[in-house]
UniProtKB/Swiss-Prot annotation:
It is an enzyme of class 3 (hydrolase). CDD domains: NUDIX_Ap4A_hydrolase_plant_like. Its EC number is 3.6.1.-. NCBIfam families: PRK00714.1-2, PRK00714.1-4, PRK00714.1-5. Its cofactor is a divalent metal cation. This is RNA pyrophosphohydrolase. Pfam families: NUDIX. Belongs to the Nudix hydrolase family. RppH subfamily. Residues 168-229 are annotated as: Disordered. Gene3D superfamilies: Nucleoside Triphosphate Pyrophosphohydrolase (3.90.79.10). GO terms for molecular function: pyrophosphatase activity.
Amino acid sequence: MLDRDGFRPNVGIILLNQKNQVFWGKRIRTHSWQFPQGGIDRGETPEQAMFRELHEEVGLMPNHVRVVARTRDWLRYEVPDRYIRRDARGHYKGQKQIWYLLQLMGHDWDLNLRATDHPEFDAWRWNDYWVPLDVVVEFKRGVYEMALTELARFLPRGEQQRNRYLRSGMRPREAHETGPETYGAPGLHPARSGSFRVNPGMELPPGACFDPDPQSGQQQVLHPDPGKA
């Protein structure tokens, strides 16, 4: 289902844990990491599609989360031709998305990447709020920045201040330039002293594995389903 400009209606999900870190999933059998997302089926509202995708990709039910906010308007990105099936080229241009910010009300063990027989992710981790901008595939970076920026104002006040600090130049991609105690990989968190250290807390859902560094592999995103691109 495409609009007249060739964009497929889609929803994106930013899921927060109790530490206001975001869920980050590794697409199955690839080195590509992203937020949960998926197309809106005919007859669905964006919120209905969001809850369906939440269950299909992460295994969570509506009672596991609280809807904090959503973006006001559609956010669009174009998908390069090399990532589009040949039979869709010339018709499919990209995605237009409504993004939802959700708070996890349950526990890590409620997440299940094998909730359906067509899983989207085979590993996951919690990251600081802005870290995904450093590792998401290039053509999605703009829409990720728009969504994260618009929804950041709904974070708790203290977390807003902390994220402004991280966003202003101390994001993990750049941290290796600041001294011997800094780090460069996603999923690490600042120590109170001002240096950076590994956060050892990581729980995996059923059937998942853990890739400790999503930046270690080349991003290869081949999408048989345009709704996931």
